[in-house]
């Protein structure tokens, strides 16, 4: 049984229902963090707790008072279920195909595997083991509201050996397409007014990663990333801080 399968959402709750109905493997707890912050989708999400599901034992809906970002809700999934041996984290606009979850669990059962990715190392679906968090830390919440939090985490094990399973091997949908990211990012696609703010934040987050790990974190830039955050050997790779001024500059307004 999957101990916890978690997601977060800002808008368009029909995607979460689609995700929920696509579950075809036993799950102890399906948790949704409502990142809307405006009380626009509260009632629709609450109804999810009343929907019977053959494979899901518990449904938890957590309405956050304001948006804490992608890395913020990823960390909440980990913290709120701290005794889990692993956490299965997924974008709200994903839909599993039959057999996907069974295959993901099979890969996760390998004790040497630290992370299982959905496809080609993607982070729209991933399984994260507890010992990986112990060694490499939580996600960097400076990367509010979204983008680069996955790439940042990947830099932490550039200079060490971490066994990952890069693809589950069974297709799944992201948005309306299967096998690619062409219709992903449904948060800003569903609410175009957010697009500009999110894209600006994305660029700011890239510059933050330049400082933290060097521009070589990007695949097209030659060189090596720093072995320690901000090229400071006194700092462990698991270090997480919170630059309030930087985060405030990217605030979405809710």
List the predicted regions and their residue ranges.
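Aromatic-glycine-rich donor-binding/catalytic loop that engages nucleotide-sugar donors
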Residues: 128-147, 156-167
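Short beta-strand-to-loop acidic/aromatic patch adjacent to the donor-nucleotide binding site
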Residues: 84-95
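Short, well-formed alpha-helical segments that are part of the catalytic scaffolds
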Residues: 11-25
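Acidic donor-binding segment of Leloir-type glycosyltransferases
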Residues: 24-63
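Conserved donor NDP-sugar-binding/catalytic core segment of glycosyltransferases
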Residues: 94-125
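C-terminal catalytic/acceptor-binding lobe
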Residues: 151-254
